[in-house]
Amino acid sequence: MGIAIWLKGMRPQTLPASVAPVVIGAAAAWTSIRQLGVCALTYPAPESCAINRATQTTLESRFWPLAILCALVALFLQIAVNFANDYSDGVRGVDEGRGAASPALPASPASSSSAVPTGTPPAAVVLSGRRDGIAATSIHAPARLVASGVPPKRVLTSAGTAAALACLCGLAIVVITGHWWLLAVGVCCLLAGWCYTGGRHPYGYTGLGELFVFVFFGLVAVLGTQFVLCGTVTATGVLGAVQAGLLSCVLLMVNNLRDVDSDRVHGKRTLAVRLGERRARILAVASYAVAFVPVAVMALSPLVLSALSLVGLPCWWRTSSWVGINASGEQESGSSGGWACALPSPPDTLTWAMAAYGVVCLAIAALTIRALLRRDHARALPLIGLSLLVCAVGYAGLAAI
């Protein structure tokens, strides 16, 4: 077997789901570290200012080594999970017919073009025919290692090697930070990765995959990275964790939507199988929109407000209270109101840069939602991964301002 099949076995389209949350967590941590240097302009300076600056210096000195180690932990864990998933599904027979050299299977009459909605691209057609008793998978389902003839033990060994590399990087993080309880978090991550499709009762076969992905690729990955880098968790980190978790869930949901017919035949009751193809697709689109569209809206809002200010908007009703002395020497009070409008504010370079970022986000969102609605899973998967990376770039950009 050549190296190409091993690279495909790593499932590169899923790797952004591991690296992007680390970038988001690192960006949130960098913002917190910078705020440690802010001190009240009082004399003499409070003692807390000196303590905060010393802490800031320490955190900044080890920021990049720890950030790189966090990224490597996430990357190696994702690769280990992908190999373990390939092994478990392969030995169970779920991936039969998904070898590197497996020919495309002809559609049965039940899945002929007459049953496909007009305008549906070829990528959306899921074959429901059977050959030699094996259920067919979707046309664009990627090849799997075990199904391609790679010995299962070699795939399992590769998963163990990737997991061991993740553990080494994790141990380095523990030694540097002194947070020994992170070892327990690492064990939970390893167990979650293996039990997705491994063991006697894999939770990926019962529709709980998305829940665990939200927890480990969202909350744990983002907030864990932030805590490792700055020793605290902030609202920015929580928001980023929710967004990363939702987008990672959508990535898994689309993957399962692509394989929904094959999974149903093999008894793999993913969330897509439990909900049904239509409802699962609606949930995927809604989750994606909730997680990613607000990023574009927030990026475009400064330009919109700037444009409105140039035409005398936005305006609001302003009420003011007053207290005075009348002619009789008695105190009087009252209130008055009137319209107030924002002063004209031409957009600056930062506003234009954010607007350009927002336009890119809107374009990606439109293409992704279109691909999801048209059942074009081959195009939707990389677009969702790109959305994760673009979201991470946005957080990194805000942290750098």
Model regions and ranges:
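Membrane-embedded alpha-helical segments that form the functional core of polytopic membrane enzymes
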Residues: 22, 35, 58-84, 183-194, ...
